[in-house]
Amino acid sequence: MPPTVSDTAPSAAPPAASPTVLTRPVRYPSDGGALLEHLTRAGQLRTTRNPADDNAAVRPVDCVLLESADITTKASRTTVAILESSARLTCWGGTVTAEALDAVDGQGPGADGLAALARLEESLAEHVTDRSPGRLTLTLPTSADDDPTLEERERLTALSTIEPLRVLAQAEVDHPHLPLEAGAFAFDYLSTFESLPEVAQGANTCPDYLFYDARIILVVDHPTREATLVGASVDTADLERRM
C-alpha cells in the first residue's frame, strides 16, 4: 500500500517548520529485534563493523528500539523503532555536538538533518561555539554550575545541555508520534543537575547522552497486531522513496 500524505500540506514557511508527514501500514512484526536484524541484512539501516576484525558482524547504528510490556502478563504492548534518523546529538559535559546524518543510501548530510541544525542554531545562537558543514557544536551551562541553593525544579527547568533536545522536540509535526527524540542517558549525566564528586575516567566511553532526531519510525501495536511506518521530512520525494 502506498504511503499517505497528512492533511496539512507544506506551506511557504521555512522547511524545518513544515515537514510532510507520510504513513504506511505494514505487515505486523512480532519481534522488533528480529526485524532490525532483517533490515540490517537487507541494507535498509545504517551499519558499521569493527575495521580491526575481518570477521566482525555488521551491526546497525543510528537507530533506536523501544519496547513496552504488560507488567503482569509480560505480554508485549507497543514497539517503537527509529529506523532512520535525521540528526545525532551527543553530549559530553557542557558540550553538545549535533550532526546531520547522511541518507542511508545517499551522499552528504540529508535535508532533514540540516533543517534540524538550522533550528538549533536559530534557537540557541548565542551558545554555538563551532560550526562546519553538517555539524554544530554548542556549549551550554549546567545548573549544577550555578547557585547550589536552587530548588530541584529550578535546576531541572533551567537552561542546560538538555535544551537542544527540547528545541527539536517542540518542532511542529502533524502526527501524534512525531517529533521523537530517543536515545540514552549515562548515569553521570546526573552531574548536570547535581554537584557530584569527581570520578576518574574509566574504560567506558559512553557520552553523557546520545540521542537521535527521528525521520522514519515504526509503531507496532501488539494487542491489535497492527504496524505503521511514520515518516516526516522536508524532502517529500525522498521520504516517499524510503518508505
Descriptions of predicted regions:
Residues 1-243:
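Signature of the chorismate-utilizing enzyme
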